[in-house]
Regions:
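Hydrophobic transmembrane alpha-helices and their helix-loop junctions in integral membrane proteins
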Residues: 1-176
Length: 176
């Protein structure tokens, strides 16, 4: 059900969606898991329930994001995927994974708020958020395009940007 409600909630005005959906509202459940982590982590049930739910959310959110034509819908489903990544980290029995989860929460809030604001600028200037109708924005809005590319690169985990370290911590904890 969250897979349907989350993207619909992104239709709010840009500053509202940037604040609510990058920093506060969507992080409430993850915050609860982080608060329960010291008491419940380390059990096999915690690993399978929380880690499994996180992995499923990570994959389903990423898959659904690939089919979005609305920029805010794309950001909504990528948020679902990132929340799955954070939940998966909290499902692991490792102090470094918990640190990586908290670090990624902060990184996610930073780059996702930037992307929401960029989408708001694009929507205001072009009158649409439909990816199929948008082209040539780099020449029409070079500053916005540059900032959106930097925020997107951070979200992708490009080295030297804030998303890289938390995703590197994710890989270090899940691969080894």
């Amino acid at each position: 059900d969250v897979y349907k409600r989350q993207p619909q909630a992104m239709a709010a005005p840009t500053p509202v969606s940037a604040y609510l959906h990058s920093a506060t509202m969507v992080k409430a459940g993850v915050f609860l898991l982080a608060r329960l982590w010291p008491a419940l982590a380390g059990t096999e049930q915690w690993f399978w329930l929380v880690g499994g739910a996180g992995l499923a959310t990570l994959l389903v959110g990423g898959y659904a994001a690939m089919f979005q034509n609305d920029l805010k819908g794309l950001l909504a489903y990528s948020t679902i995927s990132h929340l799955g990544l954070i939940t998966l980290l909290l499902g692991l029995n490792s102090p470094l994974a918990a640190v990586a989860a908290v670090f990624h929460i902060m990184n996610h809030a930073t780059f996702k708020a930037s992307l929401f604001m960029a989408v708001g600028i694009v929507d205001h200037e072009s009158g649409t958020r439909d990816i199929r109708r948008l082209s040539g924005l780099r020449t029409m809005m070079p500053i916005t395009a540059t900032l959106a590319m930097v925020a997107s690169a951070a979200m992708a985990g490009v080295p030297l940007l804030n998303g890289f370290l938390s995703k590197e911590m994710f890989f270090a904890e899940t691969v080894y």
